[in-house]
């Protein structure tokens, strides 16, 4: 089996053309300098919930573990207080 050697120039071009190429993820909360995630900030929390109503995992969003735990707790509190729906069946 033959292997094709790519130099850096071709590698960069290949990554940009590849539809599966994703940009490097970063933690939004670290960049913004957030200390505590608030359960009342629904606009931020909605960004971390998928179409089906599930909490998006940190490996997909790039959120650090410290903030992912806070995010998880904040979403659960908002759901408990009926600020957010538990499932996608409840449209706003």
Swiss-Prot record:
An example Gene Ontology CC term for this record: cytosolic small ribosomal subunit
Keyword RNA-binding: yes
UniProt keyword Ribonucleoprotein present: yes
Keywords from the named record: Ribonucleoprotein, Ribosomal protein, RNA-binding, rRNA-binding
Family: Belongs to the bacterial ribosomal protein bS18 family.
HAMAP family to which the protein is assigned, alphabetical: Ribosomal_bS18
Protein name in the entry: Small ribosomal subunit protein bS18
Organism: Cupriavidus necator (strain ATCC 17699 / DSM 428 / KCTC 22496 / NCIMB 10442 / H16 / Stanier 337) (Ralstonia eutropha)
């Amino acid at each position: 089996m033959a292997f094709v050697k790519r130099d850096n120039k071709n590698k960069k071009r290949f990554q940009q053309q590849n539809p599966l190429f994703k940009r490097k993820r970063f933690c939004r909360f670290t960049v913004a300098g957030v200390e505590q995630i608030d359960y009342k900030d629904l606009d931020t929390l909605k960004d971390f919930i998928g179409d089906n109503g599930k909490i998006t995992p940190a490996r997909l969003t790039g959120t650090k573990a410290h903030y992912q735990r806070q995010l998880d707790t904040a979403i659960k509190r908002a759901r408990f207080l009926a600020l957010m729906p538990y499932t996608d069946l409840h449209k706003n």
